[in-house]
Structure formats: structure tokens, C-alpha cells
Amino acid sequence: MTTRRDPFGPRVGSRIGSSGVGGAEYRRAVADNWHSIGLPPDALAEIEAAGIVLPDLDVVRRYRLDRVREQLRELDYAGIVLYDPVHIRYASDTTNMSLWTAHNPCRYLWVGAEGPMILFDYGDAAFLAGHARLVEEVRPATQWMYELSGIEMDRSLRRWSAELVSVVEEHGGGNRRVAIDRASPDAIHALEGRGLELRNGGEVMEVARSIKSPEEVTLLRAATVVTDRSLDAMRAALEPGITELELWAVLHSENVRRGGEWLETRLLSSGPRTNPWFQEASARVIEDGDLVAFDTDLIGPFGMCVDISRTWIAGDRPPNAHQLDVFGRAEEMIHHNMAMLCPGITFRELTFDTFVPDVEEFRHYTTQFHGVGMADEWPMIVYPDTWDQSGWDGVVEAGMVLCVESFVGRWGRGEGVKLEQQVLVTDTGAELLSSYPLGLR
């Protein structure tokens, strides 16, 4: 059964988007139970105090949908089927249990190169798309994952594939080339068995997401304010005697109470656990003089990702010579490599011409740069010693938002330092998005 937009009732978000989103207008929409993840008053006040005026969200939605359709037309695809909840949100600005649906493929979106956009949602949840004016139709999703369909999975796959093929035949203009971002082998076989030519949806979405509009950048700035204020609370809580988990929980709590959504990782470590990198927060008690390194990996308001890293020192003890040495190298790497960013520079140049401490003496991170927007994104720019294995070339463009990465820790001994800055590539270079200090204190 098809659910049209009309049964949603009043467009609870209809005040948003007519002439921009002023603070009072935004508050009225939230008070009217606008079915889109919004901001609490305190967070909105912090954002406004930073001089940020939230953009017209309908402009953001239109830009993103246009970006997806531009890629579909460029690649000559009839459309794309999206399961990744971040991809669904980018194209339609709809959500439904984002983390749960990230590992339970139970809702999906069809975006046609020439239209329409049809959301197949989980449960009786059409109302969740009430604010999403560009979603032309909402239908109940057909469930083929084993958890929901059990021994009748094949029957569910036949029904699911038949409905999608019907959409392609109705709206694809005879084109049977369709992208899909993720699916099980059974689902792929079901679609191919009905004559569709499947293509990689990751390429479509990553390239579409790589160039941010001015309005998207404003949303990133708002999420950065939320992150910076959350880091203030986290820094105030850092005292010898607190555990890594307790400190990490401050960041998570402060983000959520300001309208943020989740943290992608648990990357916070202290003292000897800072080297090598990628140890997750533990019950270790932080001691006086320990380095404490963390990566925010934060999904904030509007689903925007703020991915910055800091390394602090706990307590009143001054940093020792080793701590100052590795911090200085990591900081030099950040400043030097960030200064290289400009439109036209190639991924290869950003691999081989950057400043990197001697890899025979120091460990390094997995990437030197990576894209960011609604999560970590394309491109991922690696190190010279991993170029042959996982590097590729490309060109940096204005409008990209990139993270500049650094981890420095000696092989076999001593603490490590993790630093990371998030920048907007402009016509004249790199603009730092977070004003949070980089220092140990």
C-alpha cells in the first residue's frame, strides 16, 4: 500500500524554509513538534552568540538532492537505492533510528535521476518524513533481512525486487542501470535476476557529498560550536582520578544535550595507552602528568560531523621532555600540512610533499587528510609508505571540508599525541572551522 504525503496532516515544519530560519522561527517550529531532529534552546543560544544564523533547511535539502541527481546523470544511471542511513539523510533529510538501521537494513530510499524520490520506511512511520518536502512518496518497506523475514526471506526478496523494478520501469525511461550503496548477495541476485544492471552507489554518494554548499558549511559551523562548548565541559572535568570512560562520557553527554546525536568511536586514551593509537576508552584511572588523547568523531546537530582531536595533560605537573617532543612534532605536522591545502592541489602532492616525522622512528596515523561532512567521507589521503597499497590521485576543490590528521608516538616507548583540525577549502586556502585551542592545556 502506498502512503502519499497528504495523509501526514499539517506540515509541522512548514514555517521552516520560507524566508530563512531566524531564532524565533526555529523555536516555534520545534515547539510545534517538528518531526526533524532539532536544537534545544540553550544550544541555539550558544550558536547565535557565535554570530551564526541557521540557514533555510529547504535550501540545504534541495542542494543535496541536486548533487545526487547530477552524479546519477553524469554516470547515466536511472537512479539509486540507498540503505546507508547517512546517505538516506543526505538525500532526503529523513531519519528513523539511525544507528539501529545502520546494521539492520530495514528502510531504504529510491532517488530517480529525473524523479521521483520515494522513501520506503520501517514501521508505521510516514509521519517522520512530514518535514521533508522533497520526498514525494512514502511506502512501507519490504523486509528481507533474516531477522525480520526468517525462512520466508526468498519470498520477501521477490516482493522487494519486484517493487523496485516496477519503480525503475515506471520512472527510468528505459534505463536499467541502477546504483545501490549496500545490499546482501541475495538482494543483489534478486535485482539482477529481474534485469537490472547494478552499479556502485558509494561513488555516487561520496562524490555528491564532497562539495559543501554555503548553507551546509553554516550547519557545520553550528555543530562546531556545540563541539567546542562540549570540549569546555570535558576539559573542566579532566582531573587526576577520573577514568577514561567517565571523561569520554562527558563529551557524549554534552553533545547529546545540545542536540547532537552520537559519537562514532570511543577513541580516548591516557598515559601509556596513548601509544599506539586506536585504544578505546577504558576504566583506567587518569594520573597526574598523563597525556590524554582523544578524537571527537562527533555527529552533532543536523547530523553534521565534527572530527577534531586534541591531546591534553592531566593535573598540574609540567610536561616532560618526551611529551613536549612528540607534541611539537604533531603540532608542526598539522600546521605545515594544513597550509598546503588549496584548490587544485592533488592527492598525490598531499601524500608525498607533506611534513611527516621519520616513519622509522615514529608511528603515524592511517591517513594524512580525509573528507568530512555528515561523517568521515571521501577522499582518504594516505602516507607515502602506504601509497602503493591504498593511495589514489585526485584534485582538491573549493567547497571541500577536510580533516588534517596527525599522530606521533615513538615505536616501542613513550606516550603518543593525537591532533586533528577540520578545515574548509576556500578559493584562497584553508579556513579553520574550530577555534578550540590546540595546546596541551
Report residues per predicted region.
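Active-site neighborhoods and metal-handling regions in enzymes and metal-associated proteins
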Residues: 1-441
